[in-house]
């Protein structure tokens, strides 16, 4: 370097070193892997949105059935006029909402006596052979319904749809989560053991068992197992029968997924290093192998929830569960024979939102956990 070379001082500016960001001077506790995963997860705005949706759905499923003054299994009133009521809000007066009815003359005469009939009934002498009449009523003029404000109205049985909806979501979520947890625990352990002993007799036998179960259609397994339980004296599927049959059907999914990802990672450097250091096979499986596939297993777990709800619905359609039972499956079954817009939209939208939110959040969680994604 030429020491005699001159520099223009105007090209430089003094900077206080204390104002610089000095990473080498930062002192603090090292962050754990779980904290880093949470940070990466909530940097995804879609993950935050759908996580909040799931939280809202779960909270409503817990709070609404507990706080609602109405039951999810009994009508709001014994009066036939309480069936298929439209929504009513605080600004509606009792006489503001009219309902068009085509029903038996006897019921119409009851409504006339109740003081809720709008207009007059056709004379019996005008058509004495007529069994049905058309008329308009103001159902909220009934004394027992004057202070009733249904957010979504009532169904054909007179049950409050808002309460029924969230009680059904709670029941289906409870069954789905129980099935998913047990199927995941058993399937993950099964798949990890099979994958770590690949090439041995144990893996061959365990893999054949999975293939035998998977080759038979799932719905057939459900029917056969359900029929077996019914031979034991159970006339229809109760919750324990549903949970058992669905666990039997779905445990092979996480087992297969775990085995595949164990096979992909069993020859990696850190696994070979653990073997060289003398780590026990159980420690290698549960400490070194399984954490690598947690992201994919999270996707499988939340994907099981809408799948379980769908299969639960199929039990209602097959007549293996009573159509009057509480659950999203039974609620969706009611949609097929109803023209109640509130019932149709609420059941379909709730199922769709829950499914999309769960799958999207699972994919975001997989991206946050998977080390191959993090390194990109």
Swiss-Prot record:
The GO molecular function terms of this record are:
transmembrane transporter activity
The cross-references to PROSITE patterns, in alphabetical order and at most eight, read: ABC_TM1
- Subcellular compartments: Cell membrane
Q: Which residues cross the membrane?
A: 46-66, 149-169, 173-193, 209-229, 242-262, 297-317, 341-361
- What does this protein's UniProt record list under function? Part of the ABC transporter complex OppABCDF involved in the uptake of oligopeptides. Probably responsible for the translocation of the substrate across the membrane.
Instruction: State the oligomer form and interacting partners.
Output: The complex is composed of two ATP-binding proteins (OppD and OppF), two transmembrane proteins (OppB and OppC) and a solute-binding protein (OppA).
Protein name per Swiss-Prot or TrEMBL: Oligopeptide transport system permease protein OppC
Which organism does this sequence originate in? Answer: Mycoplasma genitalium (strain ATCC 33530 / DSM 19775 / NCTC 10195 / G37) (Mycoplasmoides genitalium)
């Amino acid at each position: 370097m030429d020491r005699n070379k001159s520099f223009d001082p105007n090209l430089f500016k003094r900077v206080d070193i204390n104002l610089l960001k000095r990473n080498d001077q930062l002192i603090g506790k090292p962050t754990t892997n779980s904290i880093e995963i949470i940070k990466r997860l909530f940097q995804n705005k879609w993950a935050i949105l759908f996580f909040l949706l799931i939280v809202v759905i779960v909270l409503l499923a817990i709070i609404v059935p507990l706080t609602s003054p109405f039951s999810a299994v009994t009508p709001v009133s014994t009066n036939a006029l309480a069936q298929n009521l439209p929504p009513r809000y605080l600004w509606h007066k009792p006489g503001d909402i009219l309902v068009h009815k085509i029903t038996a003359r006897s019921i119409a005469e009851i409504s006339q006596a109740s003081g809720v009939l709008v207009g007059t009934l056709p004379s019996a002498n005008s058509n004495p052979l007529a069994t049905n009449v058309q008329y308009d009523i103001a159902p909220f003029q009934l004394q027992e319904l004057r202070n009733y404000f249904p957010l979504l109205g009532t169904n054909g049985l007179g049950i409050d749809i808002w309460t029924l909806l969230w009680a059904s979501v709670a029941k289906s979520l409870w069954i789905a989560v129980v099935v998913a947890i047990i199927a995941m625990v058993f399937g993950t352990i099964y798949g990890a053991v099979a994958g770590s002993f690949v090439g041995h007799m144990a893996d061959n036998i365990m893999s054949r068992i999975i293939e035998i179960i998977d080759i038979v259609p799932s719905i057939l397994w459900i029917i056969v197992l359900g029929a077996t339980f019914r031979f034991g004296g159970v006339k229809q599927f109760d919750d324990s029968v549903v949970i058992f049959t669905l666990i039997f059907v779905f445990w092979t999914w996480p087992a297969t997924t775990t085995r595949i990802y164990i096979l992909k990672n069993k020859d990696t450097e850190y696994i070979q290093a653990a073997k060289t250091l003398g780590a026990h096979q159980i420690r290698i499986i549960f400490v070194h192998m399984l954490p690598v596939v947690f992201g994919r297993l999270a996707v499988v777990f939340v994907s099981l929830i809408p799948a379980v709800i769908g299969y639960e619905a199929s039990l209602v359609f097959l007549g293996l569960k009573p159509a009057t039972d509480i659950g999203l499956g039974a609620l969706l079954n009611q949609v097929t024979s109803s023209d109640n817009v509130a019932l149709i939209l609420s059941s379909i939208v709730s199922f769709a939102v829950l499914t999309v939110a769960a799958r999207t959040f699972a994919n975001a969680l997989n991206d946050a956990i998977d080390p191959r994604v993090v390194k990109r």
